[in-house]
Amino acid sequence: MADTTGRIPLWLIGTVTGIPVIGSIGIFFYGSYSGLGSSL
């Protein structure tokens, strides 16, 4: 775990790519339930 110099940690990649994906899915389902997603 100490040899992370020069490389991006896997948990950092998962966090940076996971939050926008979960957020967009949450916004999509929230919009569809509130009636905004039906126009997409």
Curated annotation (Swiss-Prot):
Main location: plastid
Gene3D superfamilies attached to this UniProt entry: 6.10.250.2070
Top-level taxon of origin: Eukaryota
InterPro entries: PSII_PsbJ, PSII_PsbJ_sf
Any one of the GO CC terms: photosystem II reaction center
Listed Pfam families: PsbJ
SUPFAM superfamilies referenced in this protein's UniProt entry, alphabetically: Photosystem II reaction center protein J, PsbJ
GO BP, one annotated term: photosynthesis
Compartmental location: Plastid, Chloroplast thylakoid membrane
Keyword annotations from UniProtKB, A to Z: Chloroplast, Membrane, Photosynthesis, Photosystem II, Plastid, Reaction center, Thylakoid, Transmembrane, Transmembrane helix
Topology with respect to the bilayer: Single-pass membrane protein
PANTHER family xref list: PHOTOSYSTEM II REACTION CENTER PROTEIN J
Assembly and oligomerization: PSII is composed of 1 copy each of membrane proteins PsbA, PsbB, PsbC, PsbD, PsbE, PsbF, PsbH, PsbI, PsbJ, PsbK, PsbL, PsbM, PsbT, PsbX, PsbY, PsbZ, Psb30/Ycf12, at least 3 peripheral proteins of the oxygen-evolving complex and a large number of cofactors. It forms dimeric complexes.
Family the entry assigns: Belongs to the PsbJ family.
Protein name: Photosystem II reaction center protein J
Lineage: Eukaryota, Viridiplantae, Streptophyta, Embryophyta, Tracheophyta
